[in-house]
């Protein structure tokens, strides 16, 4: 399995506030509304179509204030993978966030999409941090 790790992002919130959002798919999927079709979500799973490809995901593990682990659900992505959204609270108003993706790619796929996966992880982490930093304080 190959591992891709995003650049660390700073979120000016306590880890528990960030966790409350990232630990539920029904909180996350509205951000995808203009990018995907046929979006459905519950607290623990979601599915959507992107560029004609159906994606099904489910939350496999949660550690409050620390991380969530997401895996492909049955009938979804045809590759074995897992990704984590990890949080490390530095202070009450400073949490570091990063994404880690472990995916089983053959050599050809790794050469074709490896750099794109790294770039996508960095963009997603940056987008989550930007959205959390821009949201009103609770």
Give the residues covered by each predicted segment.
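Short secondary-structure boundary/capping segments
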Residues: 1, 38, 59-60, 86-89
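Hydrophobic ligand-binding cavity/cleft-lining segments
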Residues: 1-40, 45
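Intrinsic-disorder/low-complexity, polar/charged segments enriched in Ser/Thr/Lys/Arg/Asp/Glu/Gln
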Residues: 2-8, 45, 54, 67, ...
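Preference for bulky hydrophobic residues occupying beta-strand positions
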Residues: 9, 48, 57, 70, ...
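Hydrophobic pocket/interface hotspot
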Residues: 18-22, 28, 46, 59, ...
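Glycine-rich portal/gate segments that line the openings of hydrophobic small-molecule binding cavities
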Residues: 30, 35-78, 135
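Beta-strand/loop substructures that line and gate deep hydrophobic ligand-binding cavities in soluble
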Residues: 75-126, 130
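Short, highly charged C-terminal tails/helix-capping segments
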Residues: 129-138
